[in-house]
Amino acid sequence: MLIWITIGIVWAIDRVLKVLIQGNFVVGESVPVIPDFFHLTYVLNPGAAFGLLPGRTWIFIPAAIIVCAGIIYAQFKIPRQEWLMRLTLGLIGGGALGNLYDRLFIGKVVDYLDFQIWPFVFNFADSAIVVGVGLLMILMLLEDRKERKTE
């Protein structure tokens, strides 16, 4: 259940933020929130997170569907007490679903978080995916260590 709740919350927050950006900005508009550090900048991204692989929507739609299918499968395999793994998969699934929605209905992904310290603009869904993948890597490393100790 935690996976579904997390997916729903991530998707809803992502959707609300994107609708607010689309309704209040024109593409390319940038508003400084913290000058020279953080701006809200509305861009339509034809690629992956952080503008990588532009124009490859045909790769990302099936990839997101496969990720979501894998998470549905995992829902039934992960013990209930492994709540952190369930939360992690919910973050990844919610982010994947948020960007999949954009690709299917807009043709590009709405990005708006613009930290001036690097040239990438991203969104809440991207952040959820990155945090989820980071947590997944940590959990996998911890599990590997645990298995090595029992051998």
Swiss-Prot record:
<keyword id="KW-0812">Transmembrane</keyword>
<keyword id="KW-0064">Aspartyl protease</keyword>
<dbReference type="GO" id="GO:0005886">
    <property type="term" value="C:plasma membrane"/>
</dbReference>
<feature type="transmembrane region" description="Helical">
    <location>
        <begin position="58"/>
        <end position="78"/>
    </location>
</feature>
<dbReference type="GO" id="GO:0004190">
    <property type="term" value="F:aspartic-type endopeptidase activity"/>
</dbReference>
<keyword id="KW-1003">Cell membrane</keyword>
<feature type="transmembrane region" description="Helical">
    <location>
        <begin position="33"/>
        <end position="53"/>
    </location>
</feature>
<keyword id="KW-0472">Membrane</keyword>
<feature type="active site">
    <location>
        <position position="126"/>
    </location>
</feature>
<keyword id="KW-0645">Protease</keyword>
<keyword id="KW-1133">Transmembrane helix</keyword>
<comment type="function">
    <text>This protein specifically catalyzes the removal of signal peptides from prolipoproteins.</text>
</comment>
<comment type="similarity">
    <text>Belongs to the peptidase A8 family.</text>
</comment>
<feature type="transmembrane region" description="Helical">
    <location>
        <begin position="120"/>
        <end position="140"/>
    </location>
</feature>
<comment type="pathway">
    <text>Protein modification; lipoprotein biosynthesis (signal peptide cleavage).</text>
</comment>
<feature type="transmembrane region" description="Helical">
    <location>
        <begin position="87"/>
        <end position="107"/>
    </location>
</feature>
<dbReference type="GO" id="GO:0006508">
    <property type="term" value="P:proteolysis"/>
</dbReference>
<feature type="active site">
    <location>
        <position position="111"/>
    </location>
</feature>
<keyword id="KW-0378">Hydrolase</keyword>
<dbReference type="Pfam" id="PF01252">
    <property type="entry name" value="Peptidase_A8"/>
</dbReference>
<dbReference type="InterPro" id="IPR001872">
    <property type="entry name" value="Peptidase_A8"/>
</dbReference>
<protein>
    <recommendedName>
        <fullName>Lipoprotein signal peptidase</fullName>
        <ecNumber>3.4.23.36</ecNumber>
    </recommendedName>
</protein>
